[in-house]
Amino acid sequence: MIAIVDGGATKCDWVLLQENGKEILLKTQTIGLNPNIIAHDKIANEIEKNPELIKIKNDLKNIYFYGAGCGFDENKKIVKSEIQKVFPNAEISVQEDLTAAAYAAYQGTPAIVCILGTGSNSCLFDGETLHRELPSLGHMLGDEGSGSAIGKAVVRDFFMKKLPKDLADEFEQAYQLSAAQLIQKIYHSPMANSYLASFNKFVAERKNHPYLQNLVFQEMKRFFEYHILPYKNCFSCEINFVGSISYIYQDILKSVASYYRLNVGTIVQKPIENLVKYHQKYILK
């Protein structure tokens, strides 16, 4: 049995296949297993909370895990070690989520590939190798254009009294949140990035409001400036996007691309299905 796992910051999608890779046997989820966010010694425990995975833990022979926070070798080793505790008989490959995005959006030609979900990232994928210009610095210093960045922007504008009255009243009614509660959640609780990203729901439900359209537009501009324009060939190749934020705000995303005279290619909401197809075509053949 083979497992292919797409691990975002908030959740991991698991797909289990027959050993020949042709038939899907199970689809399930765990929480996100980002080693920069979750305590390392809790990774195995979180996997073990899924009864479907525990039931087949001795039957898995290969696990292809692609995870947020797995861009550094040290983090790859940590995640691999924790997964191995749960699946002792499996041969495990751990790669960063950007690799999964590149595979999921691959159309047979070189392209810039971007993640816009809870967090954000980018690379150039030539069909064989990922080429990165810049690191991903996480929600504290980076993640421009992401769900956490959009959530942070709308929360900040609410507390700093920048939101128009209609939006401020709706935000107040929806969350009844004090500054003290916000600070506690962000600075003294785990998964602050996911907490900030949860406010994106407020924006997405009102994305046609002019103020929020501009808020998202500015966040997307920041993403392009930090994560796309540094690639010298960004004007000559397609730019593919993976993740819920790129899907929800695709009209605004395309407007920003047009502003910079760039060409948007594929937009993939959930990469797991395309990731499985990529493995079946190129890796498990």
Segments from the language model and where they lie:
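Polybasic, low-complexity association/targeting segments
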Residues: 64-71
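Phosphate-binding/catalytic loop of phosphoryl-transfer enzymes
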Residues: 71-166
